[in-house]
């Protein structure tokens, strides 16, 4: 089941500093980011092995997750919010604002055989 984390953020008159350390439950092997999204829905898959951490570092977006038993919706509206997606979490990302940048940290290197595109059936 996906989980929402609050990343530690330090704020002073100079601005904000958000830290990603000792909170992500895996060793990062890959980082990618999604931006310039129109009204399209991204994702639409789950994984065999990969765990992911999704952070909307600019703008906002929504993440829908279904682990085969429970459905969850996360609205990422601030850069200190992080959603951990387990391999079994079939997920889509949508409602991107025009300025949105969604950064994703992954536990595995890209492997097309790690993707499962079939969604779970109705609960």
Ranges and model annotations:
Residues 1-83, 98-107, 111-120:
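Non-catalytic, conserved peripheral segments adjacent to functional cores
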């Amino acid at each position: 089941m996906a989980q929402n984390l609050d990343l530690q953020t330090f704020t002073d008159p100079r601005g904000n500093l958000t830290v990603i350390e000792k909170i992500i439950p895996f060793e990062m092997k890959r980082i990618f980011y999604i931006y310039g999204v129109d009204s399209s829905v991204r994702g639409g898959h789950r994984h065999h092995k990969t765990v992911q951490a999704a952070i909307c570092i600019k703008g906002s977006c929504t993440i829908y997750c279904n682990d085969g038993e429970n459905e969850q919706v996360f609205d990422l509206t601030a850069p200190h919010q992080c959603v951990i997606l387990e391999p079994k979490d079939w997920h889509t990302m949508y409602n991107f604002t025009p300025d949105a940048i969604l950064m994703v940290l992954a536990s595995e290197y890209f492997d097309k055989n790690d993707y499962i595109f079939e969604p779970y059936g109705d609960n």
